[in-house]
């Protein structure tokens, strides 16, 4: 295996493609690269700058169950704390409250700042900036904030 292996894309099963597309386009500002609605198969490819990194597949009858083995959470990195705060404002405008009541550091004393929330199917998401958390208090002592939301 090549030492240059990197993640290609993440595929998520969703219960309602239209609702999920609206969420990911609005909150994370992802663009729809392709969408398919034929023969009972509904799915879409999303990304940024023309680069694919998220696929949505309408194949689920029920929301995400965090107590089952599998995906813990999906994290998206943005350049600045302001980008994280923009996502928070969009999330709140949709009537959805983030975990921890807003942007927090990954752990006490960390420079990285994150927002933790769920998508319409309950899939746990994180959007973070590598810098900008100086002076913010971590919500969880002795463990990463991303581990227990």
Describe each region flagged by the PLM.
Residues 108-109, 127-134:
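Short beta->alpha transition motifs characteristic of CBS
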Residues 1-18, 71-74, 131-149:
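N-terminal beta-strand motif that seeds the catalytic metal site of vicinal oxygen chelate
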Residues 40, 70, 111:
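Exposed loop/turn and edge beta-strand positions of beta-sandwich/beta-sheet ligand-binding modules
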Residues 49-51, 68-71:
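Short connector loops at helix/strand junctions that flank enzyme active sites
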Residues 59-64:
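Short beta-strand/turn micro-motifs at beta-sheet edges
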Residues 2, 13-54, 58:
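Core segments of cupin and vicinal oxygen chelate
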Residues 14-18, 75-124, 149:
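Vicinal oxygen chelate
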